[in-house]
Amino acid sequence: MHNIFKGLITALITPFKDNKLDLYALERIVKHQIKHEVDAVLIAGSTGESSSLSFEEYKLLLQTSVEIVNKCIPIISGCSSNNTTYARALAAESTKIGVDGFMASPPSYVKPTQHGIYKHFEALHEACNLPIMLYSAPTRSGVDFSDETILRLSKLPRIVALKDCGVDLERPLRIRATVKKDFNILTGNDEVVLAFNAQGGVGWTSVASNIVPNICKELLEKWNKNDTKGALEIHQKLLPLYTALFVESNPIPIKYAAYYLGLCENEIRPPLTEARDSAKKQIENIITSLSIKI
């Protein structure tokens, strides 16, 4: 099985207008990613405000994205839920619509045991025939995969990757030492991408690449060509942007940045609220200083 979970994967924002999906803005957003040749796009993840979407909106978002992409790049869907039955329904619908793989986190809020996490993903694995990327986001889920659970889950044939949003930079080394198959590990934190990849990662799912996919792609290309100095120079240049995009809860800042650059409306769903004036100013300043344009 070809492993699609590698390289630069953009965790896309979901555009809204008048509390509905803005499909015209979605086309602009997706085509911007295709233009700059990202390796894949992630639809309806945390950055895509997945928890605010109805099932019908989720289907429409995926269907429209699949039509826009038209097989140019892989599409990964988010299938996270604290309800295993609902998560299975998301996975089954993703398969039906024709995405290329999906990602899911451990169920949030309910605090399952490690065995419960395993059974949740076993159920998702049985619900579809797509490749699956585990999503470690302990600050959002409240629970995380143990290394032992990752090893156990990796023995299911279609669980082939881990997106890690934690801060344990030794983890890629430990996983690579124990998982004996084509199992890719990616960071979900823009600011640690080089350190993470130096420890065995193979790319990252990026928030910043919503607006600078070209620069993020260049960074990763330099790293993969062993141009460490060049990659570090780009990474250092982007560090203030990474900081600005997490000055408030994701995706509040990136949604404003996309609005400021003309990609979509600055509309975000409750309980999230739009960025404060101080955050907006910080984002505007870094966009200006980096000469970011769409």
Curated annotation (Swiss-Prot):
Alphabetical list of Pfam families matching this protein: DHDPS
HAMAP family according to UniProt: DapA
Keyword Lyase set for record: yes
Binding partners and assembly: Homotetramer; dimer of dimers.
Keywords from the UniProt entry: Amino-acid biosynthesis, Cytoplasm, Diaminopimelate biosynthesis, Lyase, Lysine biosynthesis, Schiff base
Active site: Y135, K163
Identification of the protein by name: 4-hydroxy-tetrahydrodipicolinate synthase
Reaction(s) the record says it catalyses: L-aspartate 4-semialdehyde + pyruvate = (2S,4S)-4-hydroxy-2,3,4,5-tetrahydrodipicolinate + H2O + H(+)
Top-level taxonomic group: Bacteria
GN (gene name): dapA
EC number: 4.3.3.7
Function: Catalyzes the condensation of (S)-aspartate-beta-semialdehyde [(S)-ASA] and pyruvate to 4-hydroxy-tetrahydrodipicolinate (HTPA).
GO biological process: diaminopimelate biosynthetic process; glyoxylate catabolic process; lysine biosynthetic process via diaminopimelate
Molecular function GO terms recorded: (R,S)-4-hydroxy-2-oxoglutarate aldolase activity; 4-hydroxy-tetrahydrodipicolinate synthase activity
GO CC terms of this entry: cytoplasm
EC top class, as a word: lyase
The organism of origin for this protein: Rickettsia peacockii (strain Rustic)
Residues carrying the site annotation Part of a proton relay during catalysis: S46, Y109
Family (UniProt): Belongs to the DapA family.
Pathway: Amino-acid biosynthesis; L-lysine biosynthesis via DAP pathway; (S)-tetrahydrodipicolinate from L-aspartate: step 3/4
Localization annotation: Cytoplasm
Stored CDD domains: DHDPS (cd00950)
Positions of pyruvate binding: T47, T205
Entries under SUPFAM superfamilies matching the protein: Aldolase (SSF51569)
Chief location bin: cytoplasm
